[in-house]
């Protein structure tokens, strides 16, 4: 099956968003260490919101990025 240009762009954009999301998750891994001096619940909620990005209604065309605590 041949894909349209729009479908291909959507795939590329989706991968770009996932790459950014994964980078943000990796950068915030340290916040989940038991003795990290941060609000772990707030950071856990932020990290869950990052994981949920692909479930947003307009993904990948419009993405609302969560704000770091």
Residue map of PLM features:
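A preference for well-ordered globular domain cores
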Residues: 1-69
């Amino acid at each position: 099956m041949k894909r349209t240009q729009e479908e291909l762009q959507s795939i590329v954009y989706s991968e770009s968003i996932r790459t950014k999301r994964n980078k943000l998750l990796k950068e915030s891994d340290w916040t989940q260490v038991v003795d990290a001096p941060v609000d772990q619940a707030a950071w856990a909620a932020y990290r869950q919101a990052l994981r949920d990005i692909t479930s947003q209604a307009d993904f990948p065309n419009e993405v609302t990025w969560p704000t770091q605590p």
